[in-house]
Amino acid sequence: MTNLNYQQTHFVMSAPDIRHLPSDCGIEVAFAGRSNAGKSSALNTLTNQKSLARTSKTPGRTQLINLFEVVEGKRLVDLPGYGYAEVPEEMKRKWQRALGEYLEKRQSLQGLVVLMDIRHPLKDLDQQMIQWAVESNIQVLVLLTKADKLASGARKAQLNMVREAVLAFNGDVQVEAFSSLKKQGVDKLRQKLDSWFSELAPVEEIQDGE
């Protein structure tokens, strides 16, 4: 398994929907979450870059699909934040259509990272994202963000509760606690990304040997 250097990740482009994304090849891992789940902070912590993904004081600002390239053919995809109360209903529906379309149709999508505030996990839209991914045979990593906001005992209890709850999806769903502030869970995130980005390697090796 290749250990990628996520510090060299760079911004490629923004797209309003799946039709405006670059060609559907290589490997993509998508990041999704409610508008205040700490998605941008997690991407910045992962890549050790302060402003790779812009963090906004106004949740719901990320309305585009943002693509970042780790190395050629291996991309991180920052999906629009969902479920924020102050966003107009029509815009919410548009985002949800874009998210669903991306998860169902994007062939290069290898894994989905769903970020949830550890204090408020598994809201309706979080569950819908996981359900969509499982139905499309996409592996999921759930990051319970802002883990530093809870004491150790409460953190473990939330982690165990969510791990128990996701069993109902009958899919490949891993759950970890994460804190951008304390850098907790970053190694687990990198390990999962490395495994997803290595997924195509065995096939290529077989072809080379023929």
UniProtKB/Swiss-Prot annotation:
Gene3D superfamilies the record matches: P-loop containing nucleotide triphosphate hydrolases
InterPro entries associated with the record: G_ENGB_dom, GTP-bd, GTP-bd_ribosome_bio_YsxC, P-loop_NTPase
Binding-site residues, GTP: 33-40, 60-64, 78-81, 145-148, 178-180
GO BP term (any one): division septum assembly
Disulfide bonds, paired cysteine numbers: none
Residue stretches making up the EngB-type G domain: 25-199
Record-listed Mg(2+) binding positions: S40, T62
GO MF terms, alphabetically ordered: GTP binding; metal ion binding
GO cellular component: cytosol
Cofactor(s) needed for function: Mg(2+)
This protein's UniProt keywords: Cell cycle, Cell division, GTP-binding, Magnesium, Metal-binding, Nucleotide-binding, Septation
Family: Belongs to the TRAFAC class TrmE-Era-EngA-EngB-Septin-like GTPase superfamily. EngB GTPase family.
PANTHER family in the cross-refs: ENGB-TYPE G DOMAIN-CONTAINING PROTEIN, MSS1/TRME-RELATED GTP-BINDING PROTEIN
Function per UniProt: Necessary for normal cell division and for the maintenance of normal septation.
Protein name stated in the entry: Probable GTP-binding protein EngB
Gene source species: Salmonella newport (strain SL254)
Organism placement in taxonomy: Bacteria, Pseudomonadati, Pseudomonadota, Gammaproteobacteria, Enterobacterales
